[in-house]
UniProtKB/Swiss-Prot annotation:
Originating species: Thiobacillus denitrificans (strain ATCC 25259 / T1)
Function: Catalyzes the reversible interconversion of serine and glycine with tetrahydrofolate (THF) serving as the one-carbon carrier. This reaction serves as the major source of one-carbon groups required for the biosynthesis of purines, thymidylate, methionine, and other important biomolecules. Also exhibits THF-independent aldolase activity toward beta-hydroxyamino acids, producing glycine and aldehydes, via a retro-aldol mechanism.
Presence of keyword Amino-acid biosynthesis: yes
Keyword Cytoplasm: yes
Gene Ontology MF terms: glycine hydroxymethyltransferase activity; pyridoxal phosphate binding
Pathway: One-carbon metabolism; tetrahydrofolate interconversion; Amino-acid biosynthesis; glycine biosynthesis; glycine from L-serine: step 1/1
Subcellular location: Cytoplasm
Name of this chain's protein: Serine hydroxymethyltransferase
Pfam families from the UniProt entry: SHMT
Modified residues (N6-(pyridoxal phosphate)lysine): K229
Gene encoding the protein: glyA
Sorted UniProt keywords: Amino-acid biosynthesis, Cytoplasm, One-carbon metabolism, Pyridoxal phosphate, Transferase
InterPro entries from the UniProt entry: PyrdxlP-dep_Trfase, PyrdxlP-dep_Trfase_major, PyrdxlP-dep_Trfase_small, Ser_HO-MeTrfase, Ser_HO-MeTrfase-like, Ser_HO-MeTrfase_PLP_BS, SHMT-like_dom
PANTHER family in the cross-refs: SERINE HYDROXYMETHYLTRANSFERASE
Length: 414
C-alpha cells in the first residue's frame, strides 16, 4: 500500500526541485502573459484529490464504469454552476482544453471540405479558427476576416465574405484582440445565411462571467472556452450550447474525441465556477480592466503605440517598431528584468511569426496578486524604461530590483 508520508519531495527530489524552482519563478516574476493566471488553493486542492484515480467514461447517470456515484455529483455540480454563470441552456465540462472544445464543435457540425469562417491569425485570431497548419485549416475550406484601417474587426467585410462564401460555420473570438466583439452582429449574418454561429470566448470568459464584457451565449449556437485565463480555473475547456445541440456536442466529446474525462480537473472547474459567481470575482475583473487601461495610457505617453488605439478588456498589443525592437528582443529583455510577456504579431506584421513586431500584455495574473492602478502605472513605466534602453544592463538590473520589491509586497499566495 501507499504511505502518505512518501511525499513527492521524498520520492522524487529531482522533480520536486523543478517544481519548487517554478514556484519561485512565479513568485519572483511579474506575469503579464494574457493567457496565464493563478488558481486558488481550493482549485489546486480539487485537482490534487483522489478524483484523479477514477475513470468515468460517459456522462452523469450514464457511465460505462461502476463506482461513479460520487464523481457524478462532481460533474453535475460543474455543469449546473457553469450554466448558471453564463446563462446557458446546456453545458459540457469534459473537454481537456479549449482546442479540443473547438474540435468537438467541428466534429458535431462539419464534414471535411466544408467552409468555415474565422478571424485571421495574423490579425488577432486563434490557430484553431482556420490556421493553415492546424487541423481546422487542413480539414476545412477557410475564409478569414480581419481588421479595418482602425484596427477594429471589419464587420462589413465579414458580412460581405459570409454572403459570398456562405460558410457552414462562423467563428467569433480571438487570442489577441483588445476590443469588445459585437456578437449580435455576427449572429444576424449567421442566421441570414443559415450558418452555425460559434463563439470562442476563451480570453474573455472571466470578464463575461462578471458582466463586464458582452455575453455571447444568448446569440450563439455554441460557445467554447478555456477554464483558465481570466476565468482563473484549472487548465481545461468547456462547451456551452443551445439545448438542441447538446446531444451532438456530447457525442463529439465522448466517444468522438475523448475517453474517460479528467474528474480531478472537472472538480477544479466546479470550484472555479463557484468562485466566479461571487462579488469578489466581479471586483477582481473590474480591477483587471482598470489596470489594463492605466498601463495603456502610460505606455502611450512613453512613446509606444497600442494596437486598435485602446483596450476594452484585459489584454492589449504593443507595437514596438518605434523603439526599433522586435517582439522576440523585447520578450527577452523584459524577461531579464523578471517581467514576463510574450512576443506577438501585430496586424500586417513585416516580421516572421517567431520574431514579430509586438508584444502582448495581459493584466489578469498581476491583478490576482493584488496590483491596482498604482502598481499598474509603476509597472508600465518600468516596462518602458527597459524598452527605452535595450543595451543598458544597469537599467535592467534597476528594474529587476523594483520588480523584486513589488513581488515581495504582493505575493501570489499569502
Amino acid at each position: 500500500m501507499f504511505n502518505r508520508q512518501d511525499t513527492l519531495a521524498k520520492t522524487d527530489p529531482d522533480l520536486w526541485a523543478a517544481i519548487q524552482q517554478e514556484d519561485r519563478r512565479q513568485q519572483d516574476h511579474i506575469e503579464l502573459i494574457a493567457s496565464e493566471n493563478y488558481t486558488s488553493p481550493a482549485v489546486m486542492q480539487a485537482q490534487g484529490s483522489q478524483l484523479t484515480n477514477k475513470y468515468a467514461e460517459g456522462y452523469p447517470g450514464k457511465r460505462y464504469y461502476g463506482g461513479c456515484e460520487y464523481v457524478d455529483i462532481v460533474e453535475q455540480l460543474a455543469i449546473d454552476r457553469v450554466k448558471a454563470l453564463f446563462g446557458a441552456e446546456a453545458a459540457n465540462v469534459q473537454p481537456n482544453s479549449g482546442s479540443q472544445a473547438n474540435q468537438a464543435v467541428f466534429m458535431a457540425f462539419l464534414k471535411p471540405g466544408d467552409t468555415i469562417m474565422g478571424m485571421s491569425l495574423a490579425e488577432g485570431g486563434h490557430l484553431t479558427h482556420g490556421m493553415a497548419l492546424n487541423m481546422s485549416g487542413k480539414w476545412f475550406n477557410v475564409v478569414a476576416y480581419g481588421l479595418n484601417e482602425k484596427e477594429e474587426i471589419d464587420y462589413e467585410a465579414m458580412e460581405r465574405l459570409a454572403r459570398e462564401h456562405k460558410p457552414k460555420l462562423i467563428i467569433a473570438g480571438a487570442s489577441a484582440y483588445a476590443l469588445r466583439i459585437d456578437f449580435e452582429r455576427f449572429a444576424k449574418i449567421a442566421k441570414e445565411i443559415g450558418a452555425i454561429f460559434m463563439v470562442d470566448m476563451a480570453h474573455y470568459a472571466g470578464l463575461i462571467a462578471a458582466g463586464l464584457y458582452p455575453n455571447p451565449v444568448p446569440h450563439a449556437d455554441v460557445v467554447t472556452s478555456t477554464t483558465h485565463k481570466t476565468l482563473r480555473g484549472p487548465r481545461g475547456g468547456i462547451i456551452l450550447m443551445k439545448a438542441e445541440h447538446e446531444k451532438a456536442i456530447n457525442s463529439a466529446i465522448f466517444p468522438g474525441l475523448q475517453g474517460g474525462p479528467l474528474m480531478h480537473v472537472i472538480a477544479g472547474k466546479a470550484t472555479a465556477f463557484k468562485e466566479a459567481a461571487t462579488k469578489d470575482f466581479k471586483r477582481y475583473q473590474e480591477q483587471v480592466i482598470d489596470n489594463a487601461l492605466v498601463m495603456c495610457k502610460v505606455l502611450v505617453e512613453r512613446g509606444l503605440r497600442i494596437i486598435s488605439g485602446r483596450t476594452e478588456s484585459h489584454v492589449f498589443l504593443v507595437d514596438l517598431r518605434a523603439k526599433n525592437l522586435t517582439g522576440k528582443e523585447a520578450e527577452a529583455l523584459l524577461g531579464r528584468a523578471h517581467i514576463t510577456v510574450n512576443k506577438n504579431a501585430i496586424p500586417n506584421d513585416p516580421q516572421k511569426p517567431f520574431v514579430t513586431s509586438g508584444i502582448r500584455i495581459g493584466t489578469p495574473a498581476m491583478t490576482t496578486r493584488g496590483f491596482t492602478e498604482l502598481e499598474a502605472e509603476q509597472l508600465a513605466h518600468l516596462i518602458a524604461d527597459v524598452l527605452d534602453a535595450p543595451n543598458d544592463e544597469a537599467v535592467v538590473e534597476r528594474v529587476k530590483g523594483e520588480v523584486a520589491k513589488l513581488t515581495a509586497k504582493f505575493p501570489v499566495y499569502g
